[in-house]
A protein has these predicted regions:
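Substrate-binding cleft of carbohydrate-active enzyme catalytic domains
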Residues: 1-117
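Short proline/glycine- and polar residue-rich coil/turn motifs
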Residues: 389-395
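Amphipathic, non-transmembrane alpha-helical secondary structure
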Residues: 48-56, 106, 146, 225, ...
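An acidic- and aromatic-residue-enriched active-site/binding cleft used to recognize and process polar
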Residues: 11-17, 72-74, 124-126, 139-141, ...
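Predominantly extracellular/luminal regions of secreted and cell-surface proteins
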Residues: 282-317
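Flexible, acidic glycine-rich loops studded with aromatic residues
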Residues: 119-134, 140-284
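Short, solvent-exposed loop/turn and secondary-structure capping segments
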Residues: 19-24, 79-81, 147-148, 167-168, ...
C-alpha cells in the first residue's frame, strides 16, 4: 500500500468497544469477568502495559505516522464503583470518571509521540490534555470541530449524516440489508465540510473520511457496492472543498466512472437505476388535524425533536432516515402519549399513526397502540386498543397503525408503548380523517 501512495491507518479501540479483548483478558476489566462490559479498567496498571505492548506490535507492522486509538462511546458504567478506578481518580485529583478516559488517551498519546507516531481519535478524545499534533475525527457535529480546532488539533470531518456508508443508498426494499438510515449519493455530494465554521477554522480541516462499518457487509463485493459511487462524491468534496457544486454534472461523470469500475471488475451501485427518497416524503398529506394544537403528555426526546410540537400534524411525512428532521423520537416506558385538539367537534373516521422500524439504531414498532376521543379534553372514551408482537425484523420498515370507525370529537388522545424489548419509537405524522 505504501508503495502505491496509500497509508493504512490502524485503529486499536480504547477504552471502549473492547468486548473481544476483555473476553480473552477479563482481568483488564473492572469486573474481572468476561462478557460483562466493553471498557478497559483505566485504574488497572495492567491495562496500560497491555495497550503499550499492543501498540508496539501495531507500530512494527504499520508504517503509518498516524495511529488511531478510537476513544469513542465508552460506557464508563463500572468505573464509578471500581476500587482501582476510584484510587486512580484520587491520585490524579479528578472528580468525574470522564477524567479517567482523558488520562488514558493522553497517556497513550504521549507513548505514541515517544515512538515517533501521532495519535488519531474520535471526537470524544477532545476532553483529554493531548499534544498539539493530535488529529481528531469528528463524527457527531460541527460544534465539536470548533472545539477541537480551538485546542489546536487537526480535524478530519466524518459526520454520520453524510459519511456513514453502511446506511442505505436507495429505497431499502430494493437494497441488500444495511444499518438503517438513508444516505444517497446526492446527499454525500451536498456535504460542505465546516460550512458553519469561520473561514479561519475551516482552513484547519485536514480532510474528510467515509466510514463503512461492516456488521451487515459479508463480502468484498458488497463492500464495493456500498462504497461506489458514494466514495467518488466524497472524494470530490475532499479536493473541491466549498466550491460551487453541480450535482447533475457530477452524476453524469459518476455514471461514466461506474461503467469504468464495472469494466475493472468492481461491483458498484447502479446509480442510473436509483429510485430515491421515500415517496411519502415528497408530497404533503392533507388531513383534519393539520395545524392542530398537540399536547405532549410525555415529552419527545431532545435529540430527535424534528419540527417540535407541530411535527405530528404538519402534513409532512418522513423519509427513509430517522434523522432527516421529519421523524420525532420517543424513548422510555409509555413514552408516546399525545392529545390533539381539533379546535371544534369534528366527525372522524380514522386516526392513523405512522411508525418506523429500524433495528440497527434500536427503533422498533410499538407493542401497543391506543386511541381515545373526547369532547371536553378531560373525559376520554377509548375507541381502539391493540397489542402487537415485537420483532427485531425487518431491518427497516414503515407501518401506519390505525383505528377506523365513526365518531364525533374535538380531542383525540393517541398512545403507544415501546416494543417488548425496549428501544425507541419514531413517529412522523398522526393522520386524522
Amino acid at each position: 500500500a505504501a508503495e502505491r501512495g496509500i497509508t493504512i491507518v490502524p485503529e486499536i479501540e480504547m477504552p471502549g468497544h473492547s468486548e473481544e479483548v476483555l473476553t480473552a483478558y477479563p482481568e483488564l476489566s473492572c469486573t474481572h469477568e468476561p462478557y460483562k462490559q466493553a471498557d478497559f479498567c483505566p485504574g488497572n496498571i495492567g491495562t496500560y502495559d497491555f495497550l503499550e505492548n499492543v501498540l508496539k506490535e501495531v507500530m512494527d507492522i504499520f508504517p503509518s505516522h498516524y495511529i488511531h486509538v478510537g476513544g469513542d462511546e465508552a460506557a464508563k458504567k463500572s468505573w464509578g464503583s471500581c476500587a482501582l478506578c476510584q484510587k486512580k481518580m484520587k491520585e490524579l485529583g479528578i472528580d468525574h470518571v470522564d477524567g479517567l478516559q482523558a488520562h488514558l488517551i493522553s497517556y497513550m498519546g504521549k507513548f505514541l509521540n515517544e515512538h515517533g507516531r501521532q495519535l488519531v481519535g474520535w471526537d470524544e478524545v477532545i476532553a483529554g490534555n493531548l499534544s498539539k499534533n493530535t488529529t481528531v475525527m469528528v463524527w457527531r457535529g460541527t460544534e465539536l470541530a470548533h472545539e477541537a480546532i480551538k485546542h489546536g488539533y487537526d480535524v478530519v470531518m466524518s459526520p454520520g449524516a453524510y459519511c456513514y456508508f453502511d446506511m442505505y443508498q436507495d429505497a431499502p426494499g430494493t437494497q441488500p440489508v444495511a444499518n438503517g438510515g438513508f444516505i444517497p449519493t446526492e446527499k454525500v455530494y451536498s456535504y460542505v465540510p465546516g460550512s458553519d465554521l469561520p473561514e479561519a477554522e475551516r482552513n484547519m480541516i485536514t480532510g474528510v473520511q467515509a466510514n463503512l462499518w461492516t456488521e451487515h457487509i459479508p463480502t468484498p463485493e458488497y463492500a464495493e457496492y456500498m462504497l461506489y459511487p458514494r466514495a467518488l462524491a466524497l472524494a470530490e468534496i475532499g479536493w473541491n472543498g466549498t466550491k460551487t457544486k453541480n450535482y447533475p454534472e457530477f452524476k453524469t461523470r459518476a455514471l461514466a466512472q461506474i461503467e469504468h469500475l464495472k469494466a475493472e471488475g468492481v461491483n458498484p451501485f447502479e446509480l442510473k437505476k436509483e429510485i430515491g427518497e421515500r415517496k411519502e416524503k415528497m408530497k404533503p398529506v392533507q388531513h383534519k388535524a393539520v395545524g392542530a394544537k398537540v399536547t405532549y403528555n410525555h415529552a419527545y426526546n431532545r435529540y430527535y425533536p424534528a419540527a417540535g410540537e407541530k411535527t405530528l400534524v404538519d402534513g409532512n411525512m418522513g423519509g427513509w432516515a430517522h434523522g432527516d428532521g421529519r421523524w420525532q423520537g420517543f424513548i422510555g416506558k409509555n413514552c408516546f402519549d399525545v392529545t390533539i385538539d381539533l379546535g371544534k367537534s369534528t366527525k372522524i373516521s380514522s386516526v392513523g399513526t405512522d411508525f418506523m422500524q429500524s433495528s440497527g439504531p434500536e427503533i422498533f414498532y410499538p407493542s401497543q397502540y391506543t386511541v381515545s376521543v373526547s369532547e371536553d379534553g378531560k373525559n376520554f372514551t377509548q375507541v381502539f386498543d391493540k397489542k402487537y408482537e415485537s420483532s427485531k425484523e425487518p431491518i427497516l420498515d414503515f407501518k401506519t397503525l390505525a383505528w377506523k370507525g365513526s365518531k364525533t370529537a374535538r380531542y383525540i388522545r393517541v398512545q403507544a408503548k415501546p416494543s417488548s424489548f425496549g428501544g425507541w419509537l419514531f413517529v412522523d405524522e398522526i393522520i386524522v380523517k
